[in-house]
Regions:
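Two-component/phosphorelay signaling modules centered on CheY-like receiver
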Residues: 21-39
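Acidic, metal-coordinating helix/loop segments flanking the phosphotransfer/catalytic sites
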Residues: 40-58
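Active-site T/S-Asp motif of two-component receiver
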Residues: 61-62
Length: 163
């Protein structure tokens, strides 16, 4: 029931980038209960390797991490797999700095401030997937489009083409 209701009947693959091992384990367990497949890494360097090796439907990324911070990781992903940037949820407790405010202005996905309730994370994920699906639908014409935008009917041969 949870699977059909919350993940659209699919197992979506999520990359969770979080250096706090306890928080990462808790988030992984929570998301897997809703039928998401979650891979975890503790820093941006390992996250970039993971992105290059496997396809993910979503990235959830902390900002303050060792080796490569979340903002540097986001910009690296933007260079190598830009389509992933709209499927990014940035999580942070440090959103009040000038640097972070500038970074948030560049994020194509969403930002979630720590501390947050697990349900808020789930709702953010669902909202992001819903917005992506809506934008995909807008890019394709529905079957009814031919009724709304009919092609002209040719009823005769134009004079210049008559033999």
């Amino acid at each position: 029931m949870k699977r059909d209701l919350l993940s659209g009947g699919e197992f979506k693959r999520i990359l969770l980038v979080e250096d706090d091992a306890e928080l990462a384990a808790m988030l992984k367990e929570f998301l897997e209960a809703y039928c998401y497949r979650v891979s975890t890494v503790a820093n941006g360097v390992d996250a970039l390797k993971a992105v290059m090796e496997r396809a993910y439907e979503l990235i959830i990324c902390d900002v303050m991490m060792p080796k490569m911070a979340g903002d540097a990781f986001y910009y690296a992903v933007q260079r190598v797999k830009p389509e992933l940037c709209e499927r990014f949820i940035v999580i942070t407790a440090h959103g009040d700095t000038q640097r972070m405010q500038e970074f948030f202005g560049h994020v194509s996905g969403m930002v979630l401030m720590k501390p947050f309730h697990l349900e808020d994370l789930l709702q953010t994920i669902l909202l992001l997937f819903r917005e992506l699906e809506d934008s995909r639908r807008r890019l394709t014409l529905p079957d009814e489009a031919s009724a709304v935008l009919p092609f002209p009917t040719v009823t005769g041969i134009p004079p210049g083409l008559q033999t």
